[in-house]
Structures are given as structure tokens and as C-alpha cells.
Amino acid sequence: MVENKKPSVLKPDLKDERINQDLRTKLLSDFYSYHHTTCKRRNQSVSEEKRSTIFKKWMGKNKKVLDLGCRDGRLTRHFIDQNEVVGLDIDKIALEECAKNLSIETKWVDFSIQIPLQTSSFDVIVAGEVIEHLPCPAITMAEASRILKPNGLFIGSVPNSYHFKNRLRVLKGNLIDNDQTHLRAYNVMLLKHYLEKEFIIEKLISSRGRSSFLSIAWFGRDLVWKCRNKKQLII
């Protein structure tokens, strides 16, 4: 059972520029472990069945797959069959659960800055409900492009913060997003802005939202993408 213990330090002295990456990783790990426990985010994944079906279809079999933000492996478990999967996450407690439950390789990493993996080493990278948590998604996407093989597949999803109901919420004076871990509110245009820097977008759909078939920008509750790496083989 995970202990519901508030992190001892949530706000380091930002004036001290010598705070190193290891301490940053530890602070973020404590924060996310606390958040996932208190907000009851463990052992669940948003739109799990629909997203896992889409991801499995797109990635296929016999692939080397990197799951960015695998957490406790709730979504990851759907595509480990006949694939070699490596999971990365900042939440150390959740990551230990993932390694134990799925018996896959995991790495405790703050991938918002750098991903310590070899260039052109993966066929597929998955980022399900991850990039909204990143302070600088352009850095992570550039790293994803580097790690992917030429023409490799980058798939993922992000909440569509500007779907119709959320726009009404804002008109009523409410916040567009009340999740304290979300650092960016994405719409179709912003998502394309980041993806197209490193990738070629093949598909952009929504896995939830009754009227999303009319317009994913207005009625899709999430945005689900399938991209190819722009990086080409050098012959």
C-alpha cells in the first residue's frame, strides 16, 4: 500500500543556482508520487481501453517501444505483448510498481530536460497524456526524434483543453483546467505547432467526445496523434 505522505520539500530555494539535476528529479518524483496518490490517479488511465486499442493498432508487433510517462504501467500493459518495451517516468514509486507488475525495463528519469538513451534506438515512442506536464515540450520532442529510428513512429495523446464544454466553463469565469500538474493547455493548433517541428503528422483524431466526428477541435475531449520521424537514413 502506498503511503499518503506529503513531500517534505515542494518548493526548493530557487535562488540557489547550484541545485543539481538529481535533486530536481527527487523533488519532482516526490511531488508526483504525492499527487498521484492524493488525487487517486494510481491504477487508472484516462480512456484506457480506447487509447490502448488505437496505440496497439498503430504500433504493430515486434517493435522496440519507449513509453514516456509509463507511470505504474496501466496503459503500458496493453502493448507489451510481442514488443520490447522500456518505460520512463519521474514518479519513482509508480515506476517500481510498473517494473514489478509488467517485468519490463524501467528508468527513473526527468525526461523534460534530457532522455539518456542512445540515438536511433527505438521503433516507436509513446507519450500518452504526458506533454501537458512538460515545461518545454520542444526539448522532449527533439529528444524523441533523436532516439527514434529514421521514419520511426511517435504516438500519443493530450487533453484538448479547448473543447466546447471547457470554453463554456471559461465564459462562466472558471479555469480552463484545474489540474495543478498541467503546465500547458493544448488545442489542435498548439499541438501541431510542436509536433511539426520534428515529425510528419499522419493522423490526428480524438478517442472520446460524443460529437468529435463533427470537429475534434471543438468536441474532442482529447487529441490523439500518429507521427513519423522527419529524420531520414543517411546513406
Positions of the model-derived regions?
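Phosphate/oxyanion-binding loops and surfaces in catalytic or ligand/nucleic-acid-binding neighborhoods
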Residues: 161, 174, 197-201
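Conserved beta-strand signature within the Rossmann-like core of class I S-adenosyl-L-methionine
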Residues: 152-158
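Conserved N-terminal segment of class I S-adenosyl-L-methionine
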Residues: 1-118, 124-126, 138-141, 156, ...
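Short, glycine-/aromatic-enriched active-site segment of Class I SAM-dependent methyltransferases
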Residues: 162-182
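A structural helix-start
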Residues: 134-135, 158, 162
